[in-house]
């Protein structure tokens, strides 16, 4: 089996996209409770479409490691973001690499959005909520109560992640996917070093 090596141009593209992604990671828009929207995975998705999920994983990893330099979550937020980003770029990148059409991109983004939303729900349930509860001395019931102020039907942490985390991540990934669809083709010559 022959290994594929990255070219100098690909490494340069990875570095540039990772740097842009790391900067975007610091620009957060508060949405609801402690959830914030950022577009740092946009360059990662562009990398997945241009070069595939392998190089995109490097972009995502570099962004996450750089995010550790200014984290307030002691790395847990970056880990959750990495898991969601990977769940997005793997199917999106693989599908688009096999079907390099607008429809292939759309199908890849839809499958990736579903996978990333599920990863977001599970990483919040198993990582983020327990972590924030431990760090801030909040029992899970108190975090659930925060959610109940928005949606009274929430009864437990599963309800919290299904009614708040899931919809938030779905909207986040739909927005990132929409922007990706708008900018990939115009940026494609730059990403493929044709411009």
State the predicted function of each range.
Residues 1-195:
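Loop-helix junctions at membrane interfaces
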């Amino acid at each position: 089996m022959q290994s594929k090596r990255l070219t100098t141009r690909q490494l340069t593209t990875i570095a540039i996209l990772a740097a842009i992604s790391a900067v975007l990671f610091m620009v957060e828009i508060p949405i609801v409770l402690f959830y914030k929207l950022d577009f740092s995975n946009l360059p990662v998705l562009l990398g997945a479409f241009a070069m595939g999920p392998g190089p995109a994983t490097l972009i995502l990893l570099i962004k996450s490691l750089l995010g550790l330099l200014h984290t307030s979550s002691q790395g847990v937020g970056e880990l959750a973001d990495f898991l969601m980003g990977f769940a997005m770029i793997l199917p999106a990148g693989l599908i688009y690499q096999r079907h390099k059409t607008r429809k292939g991109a759309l199908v890849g983004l839809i499958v990736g959005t579903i996978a990333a939303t599920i990863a977001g729900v599970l990483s919040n349930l198993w990582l983020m909520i327990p972590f924030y509860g431990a760090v801030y001395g909040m029992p899970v019931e108190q975090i659930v109560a925060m959610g109940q102020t928005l949606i009274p039907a929430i009864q437990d942490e599963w309800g919290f992640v299904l009614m708040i985390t899931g919809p938030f991540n779905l909207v986040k990934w739909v927005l990132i996917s929409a922007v990706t669809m708008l900018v990939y083709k115009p940026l494609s010559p730059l990403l493929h070093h044709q411009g």
